[in-house]
């Protein structure tokens, strides 16, 4: 999500073309450019973005409604799915309304505190989604590798504790971001070449040593989402070993099908994230508008796909939806 590969030269070239560039220390507002270089196409770009946003909101609210009204879905996997739906809703609604305001009404100004709030929510709920994927992987691990103890291990109180741990972890790890940003001096520009506030984008505007912030951002990336990826990989290694040890092909396929939805959600979350991270670090010749556009698409793709994946792949949800 973070545009680390955006050079300061590119940022300033866009900034200097805007009349709001000024010298200041404590900005009251930031200017969000939207998709730099594609301003003339903002209205057209907004059409697929608005469509994905509508699908994400409708799909995730549908998941929440179905799980709440169907007693047979009151199980750990579906509780975690509801957490994922809430996370997706907050993640996309924290950025898309402002983004569409930029695209449709050229409303580029954002209050300093509102920018920090948006930054916190975007990063916090992105990390939270990673934690929920880990919790869902643990649920699948217990269900397949130790099925007789699934109901005794993943009780409702345990599910609540796991959910609370996911929320607290993401909240605490991301909390330093807005505090660091608030205490930096800004003296070059208040223009952000993005349609929403990100930690690294705001950090590039500071006239101070931001190495602490940069290193902390890398720490969060590798020690939080990186460890999540390792835990998920270990869980699915054990799951696959258990599946291949089953005596018949039909039993193996039936058991594997219970993991397909979760695997698709993981792939939809981690593969674009990995691609964007590598692109920002190594594809230095890629134009800035493409960097920003891809980052924005990534922000919407998982919230849009997750309810579709579970709606299509999960029989109980599909049957309840078709009633």
Residue spans of the language-model regions?
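Transmembrane helical core of 7TM receptor-like proteins
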Residues: 1-323
């Amino acid at each position: 999500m973070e545009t680390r590969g955006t050079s300061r030269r590119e940022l300033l070239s866009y900034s200097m073309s805007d009349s709001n560039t000024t010298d200041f220390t404590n900005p009251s507002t930031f200017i969000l450019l939207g998709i730099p270089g594609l301003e003339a196409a903002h209205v057209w770009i907004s059409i697929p973005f608005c469509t994905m946003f509508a699908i994400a909101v409708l799909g995730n609210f549908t998941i929440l409604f179905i799980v709440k009204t169907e007693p047979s879905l009151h199980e750990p996997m579906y509780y975690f799915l509801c957490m994922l739906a809430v996370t997706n809703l907050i993640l996309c609604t924290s950025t898309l309304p402002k983004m569409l305001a930029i695209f449709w009404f050229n409303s580029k100004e954002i209050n300093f505190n509102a920018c920090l709030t948006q930054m916190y929510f975007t990063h916090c709920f992105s990390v939270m989604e990673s934690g929920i994927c880990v919790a869902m992987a643990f649920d699948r691990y217990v269900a397949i590798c130790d099925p007789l103890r699934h109901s005794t291990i993943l009780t409702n109180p345990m599910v609540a504790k796991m959910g609370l741990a996911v929320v607290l972890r993401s909240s605490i790890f991301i909390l330093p971001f807005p505090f660091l940003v608030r205490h930096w001096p800004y003296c070059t520009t208040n223009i952000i070449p993005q349609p929403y506030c990100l930690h690294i984008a705001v950090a590039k505007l500071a006239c101070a040593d931001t190495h602490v912030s940069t290193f902390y951002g890398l720490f969060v990336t590798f020690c939080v989402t990186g460890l999540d990826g390792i835990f998920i990989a270990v869980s699915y290694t054990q799951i696959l070993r258990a599946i291949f040890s089953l005596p018949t092909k039909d039993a193996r396929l039936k058991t594997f099908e219970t993991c397909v939805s979760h695997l698709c959600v993981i792939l939809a979350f981690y593969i674009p994230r990995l691609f964007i991270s590598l692109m920002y670090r190594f594809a230095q010749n890629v134009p800035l508008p493409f960097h920003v556009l891809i980052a924005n698409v990534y922000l919407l793709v998982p919230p849009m796909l997750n309810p579709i994946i579970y709606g299509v792949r999960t029989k109980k949800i599909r049957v309840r939806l078709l009633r």
